[in-house]
Amino acid sequence: GSGFPLLLLHGNGESHEYFASQLEYFSVHYRVVAPDTRGHGRTPRGDGELSISRFADDLHDFVMMLGIEKANILGFSDGGNIAMYFALRYPEYVGKLILNGANLFPRGVKRSVQLPIEVGYRIASHFAKKSDDALKNAEILGLMVNEPRLTAEDASRIKAPTLVIAGTHDMIKRSH
């Protein structure tokens, strides 16, 4: 579509296809851009460590490459976490934020959800040196076990108008 840019950021272990059913709707009013995060979808992993901070820097490089000077950002789950890091690091590029299921730190996730992730991470990490699949799983699960690392003070420094979406059955703690 045309109009003000809207970046759609998917969650961990997903791709731009997460937003497939919403692209047509948003494209009526916005220039919609839905990138795949490093190591997800069609974007190669590259070298070095995967982190939310690195994904935010990748997003900066991506919007600069496209010539986007400012955009609204809708982030789901880790996409919301990336959006927060991006807004803190590159505030001049952010119009408005929509954070759906984002969290500030790993303890913000309900224990009933986080515990199986932690167990899976430990198992995958144990086998990571013997299996490329286990290594990839350990990296992806590691993002959910170890990140993001933001504080309430960090969140208060986000200057863009922000809509936070949380559902009744959300995996993020209401108090978070």
Protein language model features and the residues they cover:
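The alpha/beta-hydrolase serine catalytic core
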Residues: S112-E153, R157
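Conserved HGGG/HGGXW glycine-rich cap/lid loop of the alpha/beta-hydrolase fold
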Residues: G1-R42
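Conserved alpha/beta-hydrolase "acid-adjacent" motif
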Residues: M171-H176
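Conserved acidic catalytic loop of the alpha/beta-hydrolase fold
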Residues: S53-A71
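Glycine-rich His-Gly loop
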Residues: L8-G11, S77, G167
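A short beta-to-alpha transition loop/helix N-cap that caps and shapes the active-site region
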Residues: R42, A102-V113
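Short beta-strand/loop motif that positions the catalytic acidic residue
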Residues: I158, V164-A166
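Conserved hydrolase catalytic core segment
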Residues: E69-R107
